[in-house]
Amino acid sequence: MPTINQLVRKGREDKVVKSKSPALQKGYNSFKKSQTNQSSPQKRGVCTRVGTMTPKKPNSALRKYARVRLTNGIEVTAYIGGIGHNLQEHSVVLVRGGRVKDLPGVRYHIVRGALDTAGVNNRKQGRSKYGTKRPKPGQAAAKK
């Protein structure tokens, strides 16, 4: 426990909280050609590479990912959720934060149903997370 005199001399130091999605914390000023501290919830980017990778030890799959160059100039690896996708090189995508636990180095997700990314087809539940429009009432009965 510090004395009052020690607190007056030094004071309390704030904890430094490290961001889990640092690329979204930086903006870019194209006029000054410099980075800014303007953070945002999502950022637009262009796919530079689309591929699959295998997850960490107990799991086994081919997880889809895209390497994305964001508008602030930073290049990140983002996960493509859902079954099937239409992304290829030069596709414009919207990237949000959120890591994938079993893929090392993947700290971002691609938002389905935004910009060039199509929503997941034939999705009935949890549609908002996969950018799927609401099915028409007559269509659901006809498919069964």
Swiss-Prot record:
GO biological process: translation
Name listed for the protein in its UniProt record: Small ribosomal subunit protein uS12
Cited PANTHER family: 30S RIBOSOMAL PROTEIN S12 FAMILY MEMBER (PTHR11652)
Organism, as annotated: Brevibacillus brevis (strain 47 / JCM 6285 / NBRC 100599)
Chain intervals with Polar residues compositional bias: 27-42
Chain residue ranges for the region called Disordered: 1-55, 119-144
Keywords: Methylation, Ribonucleoprotein, Ribosomal protein, RNA-binding, rRNA-binding, tRNA-binding
GO MF entries: rRNA binding; structural constituent of ribosome; tRNA binding
